[in-house]
Amino acid sequence: MALVSAVPLDSRLCLCRTLFGLTHELKAIRRTIPNLGMCRGGKSIAPSMSMSSTTFVSSEDGVPRRIGGHHSNLWDDDSIDSLSTSYEAPSYRERADRLIGEVKDMFHLISVEDGVSTSPLNDLHHRLWMVDSVERLGIDRHFKNETNAALDHVYSYWTEKGIGRGRESGATDLNSTALGLRTLRLHGYMVSSHVLDHFKNEKGQFACSAIQTDGEIRDVLNLFRASLIAFPGEKIMEEAEMFSTMFLKDALQKIPPSGLSQEIEYLLEFGWHTNLPRMETRMYIDVFGEDTTFETPYLIRERLLELAKLEFNIFHSLVKRELQSLSRWWKDYGFPEITFSRHRHVEYYTLAACIANDPKHSAFRLGFAKICHMVTILDDIYDTFGTMEELELLTAAFKRWDPSSIECLPDYMKGVYMAVYDNINETAREAQKIQGWDIVSYARKSWEALFDAHMQEARWISSGYLPTFEEYLENGKVSFGSRLTTLEPMLTLGFPLSPRILQEIDFPSNFNELICAILRLRGDTQCYKADMARGEEASSVSCYMKDHPGITEEDAVNQINALVNNLTKELNWELLRPDSGVPISYKKFYFDIWRVFHYGYKYRDGFSVASIEIKNLVTRTVVETVPL
């Protein structure tokens, strides 16, 4: 359905006037809890949350409580213990290391002016193909220097009309130009999308023959991939995406099932923003080698594919140990007894593994899984199960930052409190080794902001108040929890994050604001109906409808989706703009975590219903190995 025009949502003007410097801050209501040292043990706490249109149960203390009806943990100890460790033998690592050396030699062969593997008629495309291949096969971390040298060479021949296949090609080439535009942008080179104007016909349209050969299809496939790396206001990229999408869908109706058709289907479905690196690697391993439109020597393809398979499988041995550690943590804090909540620690770990499969990033993967799990438990406590008085006690206990505060809490909250308390301190110790400064105070402020935001939403539920869109989104950017799930794991990575860099990528930077806003809006469009059924009236959809009387629910969702699309282009720019002073590699981890959540909301609320797409993701990326 077409977007209504009566109530346009412009991303720069309508995002609550908060993302772009126009402030109207929401003042959170706070109630002071008197002397937490005087706990009122045994007191029956009356429910004060709205019970309309939701399910509730009577707990052991006789208090009716709201529940979400979420399915249980899908991955027990037997599932984890059954994971393969057959590739942890030293011989596999030794073979992988030899292959890494051979691939480095192959990069060297294409770096000489007229080597065995290249010529002045194809050297630019060959370099781009090598860089693209190692990235999609998930082995690029071994070839950073080689990648930089290859792209520097390509960029030195870049023109306002793009490039040809080689430095001495007589004409520009769509495939090479599109692949170059995409790859150079993602690595921080300033390249204009106007190079694509030179591939239009006299009518100003992209045009290809009706025959649709494999070579031509791959040209357009790379055009599609490039079009997704769009910045605000780039009409040519919108045109390229529209044309290439239609072309590729038409091609799928004509070509037989093959690696090419599988690749097209995958990229049309996941694009870039929901395309997780390890997930793409698993697909690309299956189809790599079938592309013969670029005549790369068989030996190069063979070595790249073998290395990719080995690295994919070797990682599985590490996965098993990390998941066993995560499962012990989950049980040690009594999480299995919290039966009313979602338990998605294995799924969160998988998502982390899909964006960070370097063995040295174990702390990142486990930290991300733990924090996401705790944030999810807290979300279910604040949104459904907890009473208002319990929530006030929990919030105040966190702000006191004293383990003795748990004596005032209901039993089901005590383990959660200690898990958060211990996790912050453990992460701080790990981070201090890398960052050289104590992050406890910094992390506590982030957690306190989350608790305040949850309390605000709990009060809205309790009172039946429906806020304005502006009020809701300003609070919702915090209550989603994406800042927390990003911040602490990031601090355990191997690169230093100074206060100056944190200001550029963490709160209150525009980069962080965009991430938080997009995730809140995207999550709401997938969750708002289920949330309303549980008695949670406030969502970006319902609040937008309140602000615009007469608009239909469908049109409100369409307007929000359009806003998300515009904000996503702004996020692309914030990630890749060359004047930020922060290396793209630093921002890329933040961005990839955003992609993780974006993927989770692609089809539904995948964190509440994890038994479909995300279950398949776990199976494909961390359970199954690939045949050598």
UniProtKB/Swiss-Prot annotation:
Location in the cell: Plastid, Chloroplast
Cofactor(s) required, per the database record: Mg(2+); Mn(2+)
Coiled coil: none
Binding site residues for Mg(2+) 2: D379, D383
One CC-aspect GO term: chloroplast
Motif (DDXXD motif): 379-383
Entries under InterPro entries matching the protein: Isoprenoid_synthase_dom_sf, Terpene_cyclase-like_1_C, Terpene_cyclase_plant_C1, Terpene_synth_N, Terpene_synth_N_sf, Terpene_synthase-like, Terpene_synthase_metal-bd, Terpenoid_cyclase/PrenylTrfase
Main location (coarse class): plastid
GO molecular function terms listed in the Swiss-Prot or TrEMBL record: magnesium ion binding; terpene synthase activity
Broad enzyme group: lyase
Pathway(s) per entry: Terpene metabolism; oleoresin biosynthesis; Secondary metabolite biosynthesis; terpenoid biosynthesis
Residues that bind Mg(2+) 1: D379, D383
Cofactor: binding details: Binds 3 Mg(2+) or Mn(2+) ions per subunit.
Superkingdom field: Eukaryota
PANTHER family associated with the record: (E,E)-GERANYLLINALOOL SYNTHASE, ENT-COPALYL DIPHOSPHATE SYNTHASE, CHLOROPLASTIC
Domain notes: The Asp-Asp-Xaa-Xaa-Asp/Glu (DDXXD/E) motif is important for the catalytic activity, presumably through binding to Mg(2+).
Function recorded in the entry: Monoterpene synthase (TPS) involved in the biosynthesis of monoterpene natural products included in conifer oleoresin secretions and volatile emissions; these compounds contribute to biotic and abiotic stress defense against herbivores and pathogens.
Family per similarity comment: Belongs to the terpene synthase family. Tpsd subfamily.
Name of the protein described by the UniProt record: Monoterpene synthase like 1, chloroplastic
Species name: Pinus banksiana
Gene from which this protein is expressed: TPS-mono1
